[in-house]
Amino acid sequence: MKKKIKKIFAERSSWTFDKNIAQKFDYHINKSIPLYSEFQWIACQLSDYFLKEDSIVYDIGCSTGTFLKVLAYRHKNKKKIKFYGLDIVKSMIDFAKKKSNYKNIQYINKDISNFKFKKSDLIISFYTIQFIHPKKRQNILNKIYKHLNWGGGFFFVEKVRSYDARTQDMLTNIYEEFKINNGFSLKEIINKKHSLKGVLEPFSTNANILLLKRSGFKDISSIGKFINFEFFLAIK
């Protein structure tokens, strides 16, 4: 019998992050999203091409702050570099602050729509924009582009829709098999799917690229894609 993983319960209602989720989040997300760690590894490697001695970095939807800690360690010899983690969920920020031992990382409980950015060399968004209402996404991407320095990078990782319903059904089934193989029960998968209706709204690859282009990005590449998750690199 498969070992049951630690659970984040999702009832058949709108998805929310409760106050206890932060402690389980990293374990859960690694079990839920294919190539989660691998995409973070790619992001670390790519960061070398954007970060300088006095760079500013933003992680939008930083959750528990784990990735920013990895990034801060990688660039520990850049003494003036500053990292900012933003998340709308207070319990995530509180947890991130408790486990952080880097003086150059600041965690902020703030909605990106109301946040005032400084000019930065790198902005990161792992699986965050997909939770923002579609009518607000273009303004968010415009804001990101505006506050990047020339030559700055935007690491944009999202769940994506397929171009046609048949392929979407295939990939959804494959993704559900992935979660079952990682210890989730069918009931958990169904409840999670229902709870995310109207909350998680993925765009297609083309729609995400159009968002980036309309905001001003010209150099846009798909760095990696697995099932229905994709890593975009956009450079100003």
Positions of the model-derived regions?
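Conserved alpha-helix/loop element of class I SAM-dependent methyltransferases that forms part
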Residues: 37-53
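A short glycine-rich, Lys/Arg-flanked "PGG" loop and its adjoining helix->strand segment in the class I
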Residues: 138-150
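C-terminal alpha-helical "lid/dimerization" subdomain adjacent to the S-adenosyl-L-methionine
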Residues: 159-211
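N-terminal, positively charged/glycine-rich alpha-helical extensions of SAM-dependent methyltransferases
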Residues: 1-24
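Class I SAM-dependent methyltransferase SAM/SAH-binding core
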Residues: 58, 63-113
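Core SAM-dependent methyltransferase catalytic element
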Residues: 215-236
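A conserved beta-strand element that flanks and buttresses the S-adenosyl-L-methionine
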Residues: 124
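Conserved beta-strand signature within the Rossmann-like core of class I S-adenosyl-L-methionine
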Residues: 151-159
